[in-house]
Amino acid sequence: MAALGRMVFRGKSGKSYRFKVYPLGVRFRKISGVYIIGSRLPGTNGGHRLVPLYVGHTEDFSQPFGQHRKAREFTKQGADCVCLQSDDSEESRLAKERDLIAGLRPACND
């Protein structure tokens, strides 16, 4: 499936990270990376804005997000999309995840 668009998120460090945005529920092939579960809301000028609800990383995007341990929480918060950035390095994924959680403070991250 084609991406809904692209989003840039800024971590606490000030670094910007580019993500592709997809509807929640889309199946992906087995790749690793960082993801943001979000809720798309109408923005100004006819576009959308995205409220980040959860930031995580995975070795396998082919695992359905509906099976995630926080899936009920996402749903209650209005989750309707997932933003993906592929990254093969576990060290890099963890660093990005920490930076984005600290900068975005998503509601569903503990």
What residues fall within each predicted segment?
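Basic, amphipathic alpha-helical patches used to engage nucleic acids or provide basic targeting signals
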Residues: Q63-E73
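GIY-YIG nuclease catalytic motif and its immediate N-terminal context
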Residues: M1-E59, Q63-P64, Q85-A102, P106
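Short, surface-exposed basic-aromatic patches at helix termini and helix-loop junctions that form
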Residues: E73-K76, A102
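A short, basic-hydrophobic beta/loop patch
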Residues: K76-S86
